[in-house]
Amino acid sequence: MWSLAALVIGFCIDLLVGDPHGFPHPVVLIGKCISVLERGLRCICPKTPSGERAAGAILWGAVVIVSTAVPALLLWLSGLVSPWLRLALESVMCWQILAVKSLRDESMKVYDALESGDLAASRYAVSMIVGRDTDRLDDAAVTRAAVETVAENTSDGVVAPLLFLAIGGAPLGFFYKAVNTMDSMLGYVEPPYKNIGLVPAKADDVVNYIPARLSALLMLAAGGLMGLDTAAGWRIFRRDRRKHASPNSAQTESVCAGLLGVRLAGDAWYHGVLHKKEYIGDAAREITHEDIPRVCRLMTVTAILTLLLSCGVKLPFALERRHRCCIKRKINMAATCTAAVSHWIFPPTPTRLARPPAFWRRYAAGCPSCTATPTPTAAGWCRPSQPMSRCRRRMSSAGTARRT
C-alpha cells in the first residue's frame, strides 16, 4: 500500500515538476558509476573480444547490484525511523525514475526551434534526446527523429518504469533504470562498445520484452481516446513491429507511425557510420512540426493509462495483504485476551519444587562433567553452567531408560 501511494505521488510530482536543472539525479550517478567501471575494467581485463565481453558482464552485474541495493537499504533505514519518512523518500525516488515531463519538455525544445526556423538550434536540441549524428539532418529528418525518440521512450522512460515500480517499488525501478542506462551508454555495435556492450544490450532486450509490447497496446488505447486512427495503428503495428535491429524498439514506433499516418525510421548515421534501416509506417502524409506536440500528448495519455492499470492490478493485492495482517492482529489480540481471562478465572495452583528426580541424580552421578547439586529452573532441573539442550538430552534419555 505504501509503495503504491509513493508511485502515485511520484507520478504526480513528475507531471508537475519534471527534472529541474541542477537538481541531483540518481541516473546521473549511475552513469558516472558506469563510466568509472568501464575505464577500470578495460585496464584490468584482456584486450580480446572474450575479455571485453567478460568485462561487460562484470560491469552489468556490479551496476545492477549497487543500483538496487542502495535504494533498498535507504528505504529500510527510513522505515525504521517512520513509515511516513519512507513514504516521502520513496515518492522522491519514484519521481526521479519517471521521465514524462522531461521527455515532453526536451522534445518541445526541438519543436520551438523548428518553428522559429533555426535548423542549427533544432539539431542541437534533438541531439540531446537521440543517439544518432544530427549534423546531416534536415528539417523533416529532425522532426522525424524527435517523434521517433518520444515514441520509443514512451516504453523505455514511461511505461516500463511504471510497471517495475508497481511490481517492486523504487528498488526495482532503479534496477530497470540501471539496465536501461547501461544499454544507452554501451549498447552499440560499433567499436569500442561492440564487445563490452553485448551483455548490457542483450539484458535490456530481455528486460524490456514484455513492457514494450504492453506499451504498444496501451498506446493504441490512448490513440483511441484521442480520436486517432487506431485501425491503421493496429495494422502498422502487426506489419512493421519487427522492422528494427532491436526486438523492442519498433513496437511503439510502429503504433505511433500508424496512429499519426506518417513514416518513421529509415537510414541514420551513428558515430560516423551509416546504418541502413527499413521504414516503419506508410507515408499517408508528410511529417510536420505539429506531430511533435501530438506525439507528446499521446505519450502523456499512455502514461496515465499505465498508472491506472498498475494501480488497478496492484490495489486488490495490497488491500488483501492489509486485510490479512489485520485479521492476524485481531486473532492474536483475541488469543491474548482469552488467555488473560482464563488465567484470572482459573488461577494456577502454586506448587512446591520437588527434589531432583532419581533418574537425574543417577545419570548426573555417572557423568564427570556434571555436578551433584542440580538447580531448579522453569524448564526442569538443570546445571547453570551446562547448556540447556545438553541437559535436556540427558534428562530425556535417562527418563526413557528408566521407563523401559
Give the location of each predicted region.
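N-terminal, intrinsically disordered charge-dense segments
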Residues: 338, 349-351, 355, 377
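Positively charged N-terminal leader segments that act as targeting/secretion signals
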Residues: 323, 327-342
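Cysteine-centered motifs
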Residues: 325-326, 337, 367-370, 382, ...
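Hydrophobic alpha-helical transmembrane segments
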Residues: 1-175, 179, 187-326
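Short, intrinsically disordered C-terminal tails of secreted or membrane-associated proteins
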Residues: 392-393, 397-403
